[in-house]
Amino acid sequence: MAKIYKDEDISLEPIKNKTIAILGYGSQGRAWALNLRDSGLNVVVGLERQGDSWRRAIDDGFKPMYTKDAVAIADIIVFLVPDMVQKSLWLNSVKDFMKKGADLVFAHGFNIHFKIIEPPKDSDVYMIAPKSPGPIVRRSYEMGGGVPALVAVYQNVSGEALQKALAIAKGIGCARAGVIESTFKEETETDLFGEQVILVGGIMELIKASFETLVEEGYQPEVAYFETVNELKLIVDLIYEKGLTGMLRAVSDTAKYGGITVGKFIIDKSVRDKMKIVLERIRSGEFAREWIKEYERGMPTVFKELSELEGSTIETVGRKLREMMFRGMKQISSH
């Protein structure tokens, strides 16, 4: 079973007198910077240029610095920019400007696990991966709560890397919910697998296939949309709140029986075998190499798919129905 740490198990002492540089001020960067500061820690914000993020950091009471200047004074350097930006940031603005022995911290293991960034041998390298978007990390902290997180250690030169990772998790509020000890390998591979097989890839293709099947068989697109897209949120919310058995107990007996019997027919052994192929592509680094090439070419596959999807029937119908539903909700809220 996983090792889970709670707020009372963790001390801020290992990072109390450290300067923490948050690189990036987007969704996670802003949440981490504000939460760590509110926890009484010394935070600086490092950015590549003076833009919207720079102005927002100033509005939040920070004095942002250029990345090179921030890492030069930091004891702990936290990468909170997108995965595919981290390599160039590392090479151009961090590697040759950071203090010797400064810690390198990540919120996702991609660049370290696949050796895209190769850290100095004298640095502690660790990860804190909150299991929610940045705005929720911030909002839950302000309400006195927190979101769960994973922590992992890649290099432990000081002998205190785990304690520092846990302290940061406490500082951003995650320990209030619970912090699970993991590894860079486990976090990276499971995160990519989840995105590809269910959260983005799997669910999107299942939605499209079910919608298109109904429309091809003569059902009205608007009705098909409600049944295959709109009602999905109701089911996911039930699973989120009550688990799979709680969801099954909450739906009708007809839905229960149909879902239990037909679900196994749709997601059969052949689908599970494909999932194992996907997992092996991730483990071997094949997906990472493919994605890096795609990114370096300007993401033609991604933009082609987005363009085709945007003009599809499911999206055209969806835009119309969402406008209709939101208009109805606005009318209710105005009364």
Curated annotation (Swiss-Prot):
Its EC number is 1.1.1.383. Mg(2+) 1 binds at residues 191, 195. The active site is at 108. One of its GO terms (molecular function) is ketol-acid reductoisomerase activity. It comes from the Archaea. Involved in the biosynthesis of branched-chain amino acids (BCAA). Catalyzes an alkyl-migration followed by a ketol-acid reduction of (S)-2-acetolactate (S2AL) to yield (R)-2,3-dihydroxy-isovalerate. In the isomerase reaction, S2AL is rearranged via a Mg-dependent methyl migration to produce 3-hydroxy-3-methyl-2-ketobutyrate (HMKB). In the reductase reaction, this 2-ketoacid undergoes a metal-dependent reduction by NADPH or NADH to yield (R)-2,3-dihydroxy-isovalerate. This is Ketol-acid reductoisomerase (NAD(P)(+)). It comes from Ignisphaera aggregans (strain DSM 17230 / JCM 13409 / AQ1.S1). The lineage of its organism: Archaea, Thermoproteota, Thermoprotei, Desulfurococcales, Desulfurococcaceae.
